[in-house]
């Protein structure tokens, strides 16, 4: 059994805390509300900006993944993506709204590509016996980051600070909490080979891998199924949920923040539970349970708004918090199983 230094593990966990501060405050809540409620953009325009970022991530993701595989270069790639995200987040709202949206797209690209590399570093801080548990701890740390980001943003807002100043505070928090990962995480040696590959070549590898996947029972179904449910969940938690609560459900920004805070608390508890359960039962069973619970949650949200049963929104918040943590935790673990 490979032994991991506590300093390396804690530093890896702190990065999860750092990037979840960003994920919750910027795309998850404040930027989307600022763009739609303050600047008059529509949720469709927000969705288009988010989709544009995701298309670029889909193109560059295989290249980033290939570059980080088979060599000790993950931390360098993670540093590049993190700087991209932090710098563009710090500048949000500094210029006009159009440039701010472009910066938002850049920050999303940096965040998501960084997550690809960060997930790959899981093998450097865990072994086969405790990988699910460590991943679950990472998610729990991540949602602690959401609470920190939520707390700082709420205090700043109550003191009269602007959205722009909240954006900058998030960038600073991301920087502070991510630094230990670059200083203390020790990468496991895989290969001294330096991978040189173009973006086009990486896409060709993806196409060939897709064709090759048909030789493995269940893998094609897994990839197709994951695409559909992951796309739906990413769309929901990357800003449209906060806009829905304010614009469609008619809640105040304060009420929507309370619901999301409730979901975070549930997520922290669920992170450890799902980590232990994944080690015992495997990610496949838990993913099926999670998808079923997502269907129930979204159905309750529709009923709540159609029949003006706002108490159901809070029930949805509880289920959504548990579902979100299951999805986030199993994202890395399930991929390794296949």
Model-derived regions, located:
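Juxtamembrane intracellular "pre-TM" segments in multi-pass secondary transporters
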Residues: 2-6, 189-223
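Helix-loop boundary and gating motifs at the non-cytosolic
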Residues: 3-54, 221-225, 231-248
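Cytoplasmic membrane-interface "Motif A"-like loop-to-helix N-cap segments
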Residues: 70-82, 280-291
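C-terminal ends and interior cores of transmembrane alpha-helices
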Residues: 83-96, 293-306
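Hydrophobic core of transmembrane alpha-helices in multi-pass small-molecule transporters
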Residues: 99-113, 312-325
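Conserved small/polar residues in nucleotide/adenosyl-binding loops
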Residues: 328-337
């Amino acid at each position: 059994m490979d032994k991991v230094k506590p300093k390396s593990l804690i530093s890896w966990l702190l990065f999860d805390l750092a990037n979840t501060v960003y994920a919750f405050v910027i795309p998850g809540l404040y930027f989307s509300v600022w763009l739609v409620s303050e600047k008059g953009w529509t949720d469709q325009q927000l969705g288009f900006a988010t989709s544009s970022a995701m298309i670029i991530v889909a193109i560059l993701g295989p290249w980033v993944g290939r570059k980080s595989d088979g060599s000790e270069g993950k931390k360098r790639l993670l540093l590049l993506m993190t700087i991209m995200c932090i710098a563009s987040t710090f500048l949000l709202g500094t210029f006009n709204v159009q440039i701010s949206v472009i910066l938002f797209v850049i920050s999303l690209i940096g965040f998501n590509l960084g997550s690809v590399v960060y997930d790959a570093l899981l093998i450097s801080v865990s072994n086969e016996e405790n990988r699910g548990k460590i991943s679950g701890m990472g998610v729990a740390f991540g949602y602690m980051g959401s609470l920190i980001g939520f707390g700082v943003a709420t205090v700043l807002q109550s003191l009269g600070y602007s959205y722009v100043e909240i954006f900058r505070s998030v960038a600073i928090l991301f920087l502070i909490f991510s630094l230990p990962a670059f200083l203390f995480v020790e990468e496991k040696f895989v290969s001294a080979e330096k991978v040189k590959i173009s973006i086009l070549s990486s896409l060709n590898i993806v196409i060939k891998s897709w064709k090759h996947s048909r030789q493995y029972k269940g893998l094609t179904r897994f990839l197709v199924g994951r695409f559909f449910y992951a796309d739906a969940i990413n769309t929901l938690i990357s800003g449209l949920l906060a806009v829905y609560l304010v614009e469609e459900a008619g809640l105040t920004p304060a009420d929507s923040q309370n619901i999301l805070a409730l979901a975070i608390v549930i997520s922290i508890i669920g992170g450890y539970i799902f980590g232990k359960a994944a080690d015992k039962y495997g990610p496949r069973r838990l993913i099926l349970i999670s998808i079923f619970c997502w269907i129930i949650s979204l159905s309750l949200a529709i009923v709540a708004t159609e029949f003006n049963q706002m108490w159901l929104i809070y029930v949805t918040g509880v289920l959504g918090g548990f579902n979100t943590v299951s999805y986030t935790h199993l994202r890395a673990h399930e991929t390794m199983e296949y």
